């Protein structure tokens, strides 16, 4: 393994060591999005469209790990475990998987996991990770709308919807509802201007009403800002009760 930079505390999350092996001499921990403003600065330096940034830049791999290891999704995964605690081997689709941090963790917890994302740098990085871990898990490139993905018990989709245009947001929510019996998806709304130009502005209630008009749906808010407004909302919906 190459010698890699450490963070200020002298410790680096193990997933970054995987990325260091993957990138070799191109590894640079300074690319890690240590705070929200850094993500915006990285995005601005790259230029191009959001889709091009997601598909092409190596920065995305650092930011994906940084965000996935901060524990933001813990309450969502706790609810997933509570729903599926007596159903070992449940089939779970990690949709918009990025580097697959959540899906890989769920695999080691006993779930039968598959991954789906657009074809780009993060999907290639995920393929490398699975090979390095000797995991034979399915990966689907969702660029083709007619792609047949086997029906799942649960689909999870975290930190994805805010990157999509309003039309594609609804298309994705519908597609997820057709892929699994139960869907867990979070909605992210930035409380300030930090992510302006990176995230779409989401209307939580409008999207909740949209999903509720088609499926049974529960909604729970998380991470209130200084004014008490939630920065995230978890939707659980589908054809079975959560």
Predicted segments, located by residue:
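A conserved beta-strand element that flanks and buttresses the S-adenosyl-L-methionine
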Residues: 156
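A short acidic, helix-capping loop that chelates divalent metal ions and anchors anionic groups
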Residues: 191-196
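Class I S-adenosylmethionine-dependent transferase superfamily signal
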Residues: 176
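Conserved acidic residues
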Residues: 90, 153, 181
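Conserved beta-strand signature within the Rossmann-like core of class I S-adenosyl-L-methionine
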Residues: 180-190
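Hydrophobic adenine-recognition pocket in adenosine-nucleotide-binding enzymes
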Residues: 160-163
